[in-house]
Amino acid sequence: MSNLITAAQAKEFDIKKCLVHSNDGTTKSDIGVLITDLYYFEDLFSPTLKVDILFGDTGTVKEGGVFKNAVDALQMVGTEQVDLELIDPNDQKIKVTLYTDAIVPIAKENRKSLVSVTLGSKESIMNYKTTVNYRLDGRISDHITRILTETLKVDGKKKLDIEQTSWWKM
């Protein structure tokens, strides 16, 4: 049995696809070949994963017959869907859909720029952008279920594993 690699440099990932969809759904582009650095984070104490990518935006996205840089063509402002497929250093295929959280231009010149993008799950992004503005009475487990389904609108395909409140004085 071989030892698993638990930490790896970005160069060791084989990026198969990094397809970014614009928020209006009209434009999409695979920026996988533009990525210079990729940092993939999984944490035992975090309910979600996080990916940071750094890419050279060189005007390779065609929109309306004109080549534009990816940030402008996709109108990247946050919450864009990103379909990511890669193979990690342990030869495990990772296929995940994430959403853009932070888009930071690091360096910009005429027709080219260096951009840092932070990706996270839809729930983690919605968690920071949504507030609960109503009072809740009753069992804590019922509150969690209500917040996840009604306020955060967690996908119905995901199984909610919520431990029921065992003691509650009515």
Residue ranges and their predicted role:
Residues 111-170:
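Charged- and aromatic-enriched interaction segments used to assemble
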